[in-house]
């Protein structure tokens, strides 16, 4: 069950990959691992946002311990800790996570400005896409299967080297 991440501390990557494949086949739609900046599905956007929160915190841990192997770290991020609750009540937990990652943001902003800028730009885009949905009654309803696709795509986007557009140069 992908909503219960804590049950798979050593095998999360495999569970995630299998879940993505099963959901892809079950829903018969084309899901690409590439980030879809046009997707305005509530679950997809909340998945992307959770990935941003997790990446910000992970970068802070990397700054603190640059020589420590990621796999050795037993540190649980707030995104991991609140995963189950977030998938059940995303809008409520989003505000909680925003407050919890503030100290991590400051450290990343000071020590890895480029990474901070990339994550902050992505977050601003997601929040802008979520803004029209925030007034709806169903904003805090449990997330559907598209959540995991948004989460995965955002993380893949972060770890993939991006070519600069002429407008960015």
Language model: regions and residue ranges:
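Intrinsic-disorder/low-complexity detector
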Residues: 1-169
């Amino acid at each position: 069950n992908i909503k219960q991440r804590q049950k798979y501390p050593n095998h999360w990557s495999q569970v995630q990959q299998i879940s993505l494949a099963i959901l892809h086949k079950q829903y018969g739609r084309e899901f690409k691992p590439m980030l879809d900046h046009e997707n305005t599905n509530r679950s997809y956007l909340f998945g992307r946002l959770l990935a941003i929160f997790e990446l910000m915190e992970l970068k802070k841990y990397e700054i603190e311990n640059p020589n420590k192997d990621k796999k050795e770290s037993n540190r649980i991020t707030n995104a991991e800790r609140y995963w189950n609750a977030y998938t059940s009540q995303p809008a409520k937990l989003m505000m909680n996570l925003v407050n919890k990652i503030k100290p991590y943001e400051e450290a990343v902003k000071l020590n890895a400005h480029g990474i901070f800028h990339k994550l902050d730009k992505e977050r601003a885009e997601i929040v802008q896409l979520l803004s029209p949905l925030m007034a709806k009654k169903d904003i805090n309803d449990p997330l559907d299967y598209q959540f995991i696709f948004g989460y995965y795509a955002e993380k893949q986007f972060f770890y993939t080297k991006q070519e600069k557009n002429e407008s960015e140069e």
